[in-house]
C-alpha cells in the first residue's frame, strides 16, 4: 500500500493545550506522524511518497471563504498583539448572543474556534494546507488506479482491493464548514471526498472509526445525499465533542438518512463495537458506494489517554479485514490516536489487515 506523507506536518508544533484546567503539552504533536511513518517503513507496507500541491480550490469547495482567510492570517494577527502565548479560544458566541464576527483577533479566534484545547500556533496554516494535499494526493492516486486498473496494493492480484494511506497531520474530522477545534483546521477526509465527487465518483462514503465523533464531517455533508457519513464513537453525553454525534442526528433536507451515528458507552469492548461496525459496513454496501474514505482514528485503543473504549491491538487487524471485505477502493485518512507507544502498531495493523 502506498503511503502519502509530508514533512511539513512538523510546522504544526503547538506548545500548549488546555486540558483538565491546566495548560499542558498537546497530545497531538509531531511525534505521532513520526511513529506511524516508522512503523510503515519497518513493516515494509509499501512506497512512501510526497504529496503534490492542489491549491485552494478544493478547500474553498467545502469551507467558508472567510473562515479560510482567517486561518491563513490568524497567527500573523495574533503575533502582532501583546499576547505572549498561542492563540487559544476563550470566548464564544453562545446561546442568545450575537453571531457577528469581531474585528479583534482574540474575538475572531473564539468566533471560529469551538473548543479551547486547540491553539493556533506558528506554522499551523502551512501544516494544515499540506495535510489536505496529503489527503488529495491519496484520492487522486486511488482514482487513477480505479480508472486504469493499475494495482497500487499488495498482494498484486486481480482480487486485491485497492487501498491508499494518507498520513495526514494535523487531523481534520472535527473541522466544520466554518469552525476549527479538536486539533483540526481543514477537514482532510471531507475535502478528499468532495474532490472525488467533483472528479466523477457519484457515491462516496466516509466511515469514521475515530473515538471522537467527526462533528466537522457531519456538519459539511448533513444536508446532502451523495456522500454517506457513518461514525462509531464515544457517546457525546460522556465524550468530546459533546454536542454532536447523537443517534437521532440522521441528516436534514435532501440529506435525511445519509448520516448514521453509533454512539457507544464508556468501557465498550471490541465485540460490542464490532457489532455496530458491521451495521455501518452493511449500510456502505447498500449505498452502492463507489469509493470509501476511512477517517482512521485509533484512539479507540484501550490505553489511549483521551478515550474510554477498550479495543486491543489485534482488533485493529480485524477492522482492516472487515473493511477489505467490502471490496471498494479505499482511502485511509489519518485522524486521531494518542497512545504514542502503540500508535504505529495500531494504525499499521488496520492497513495490513486490509491488505492480507
Regions found by a protein language model. Name each.
Residues 1-207, 212-356:
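HDAC/HDAC-like amidohydrolase catalytic core signature
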